[in-house]
């Protein structure tokens, strides 16, 4: 399924045990993100969504499950990231961005957060999502209008331009992540769709000012070992150029 046997086994266990915990509240489980696009590699987050009949508030058993899985030897166990979302909320874009039970990459605990409650997540799930259990994702999510994606992208662009100027968390992970994410946002603004990181950067290399091409190419090349890079300082020259890039594109 994913091309990684140990990840397939982990996902199968996750789905089986979540289904057992939720019982008749379980609707389905899905992969989104890089694995849905078919561009994942050994450094990718494992983006999942569990769809439920209602907002799950009794989290004790799920918390225990995620804490246990996080302790497994396979590195994939520390890179699960996803939310538990009611089918009624998932169906169409939620203007309120209701917080959901969310497992962050690297975390062993669910927290209440709207991370997956976005137009982008719905679009990726509907158009590319992989069903681990339950009906096809297209049966659960209405088409996401391009203008909804563009509206969200405009807000995201402002947020990321602001984040570029926050000095306290600059590191070797943030710098290329910011460049790639800005390329994805710009592609969505231009085309009203959502594509993979690689496809968005390829688009950027065709469409953006050549000044930014070395920055985009570098961001693609330094992808391996994101955890290690998180604890390393960002290259000062790349940091300055990334801030300039964020400022320039946020004025488009």
Give the residues covered by each predicted segment.
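Short, solvent-exposed loop/turn segments at secondary-structure junctions
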Residues: 36, 89, 184-187
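Helical scaffold of the NTase/Pol beta-like nucleotidyltransferase catalytic core
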Residues: 1-29, 58-61
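Conserved nucleotidyltransferase catalytic core and NTase-mimicking acidic/glycine-rich helix/loop elements
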Residues: 123-252
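Conserved NTP/Mg2+-binding pocket subregion across the NTase superfamily
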Residues: 1-3, 64-172, 179
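Catalytic metal-binding acidic patch
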Residues: 29-68, 79-86
């Amino acid at each position: 399924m994913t091309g990684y046997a140990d990840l397939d086994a982990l996902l199968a266990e996750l789905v089986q045990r979540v289904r057992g915990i939720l019982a008749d509240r379980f609707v389905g489980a899905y992969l989104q993100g890089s694995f849905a696009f078919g561009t994942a590699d050994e450094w990718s987050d494992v983006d999942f969504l569990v769809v439920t009949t209602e907002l799950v508030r009794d989290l004790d058993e799920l918390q225990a499950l995620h804490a246990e899985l996080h302790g497994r030897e396979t590195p994939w166990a520390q890179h699960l990231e996803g939310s538990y979302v009611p089918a009624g909320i998932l169906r169409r874009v939620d203007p309120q961005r209701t917080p959901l039970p969310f497992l962050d990459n690297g975390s062993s605990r669910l927290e209440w957060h709207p991370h997956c409650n976005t137009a982008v997540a719905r679009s990726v799930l509907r158009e590319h999502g992989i069903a681990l259990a339950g009906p096809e994702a297209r049966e659960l999510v209405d088409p996401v209008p391009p203008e909804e994606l563009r509206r969200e992208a405009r807000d995201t662009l402002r947020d990321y331009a602001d984040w570029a100027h926050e000095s306290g968390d600059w590191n070797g992970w943030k710098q290329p992540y910011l460049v790639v994410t800005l390329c994805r946002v710009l592609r969505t603004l231009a085309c009203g769709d959502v594509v993979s990181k690689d496809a968005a950067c390829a688009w950027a290399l065709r469409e953006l000012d050549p000044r930014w091409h070395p920055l985009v190419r570098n961001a693609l090349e330094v992808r391996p070992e994101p955890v290690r890079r998180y604890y390393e300082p960002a290259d000062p020259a790349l940091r300055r150029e990334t801030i300039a890039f964020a400022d320039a594109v946020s004025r488009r």
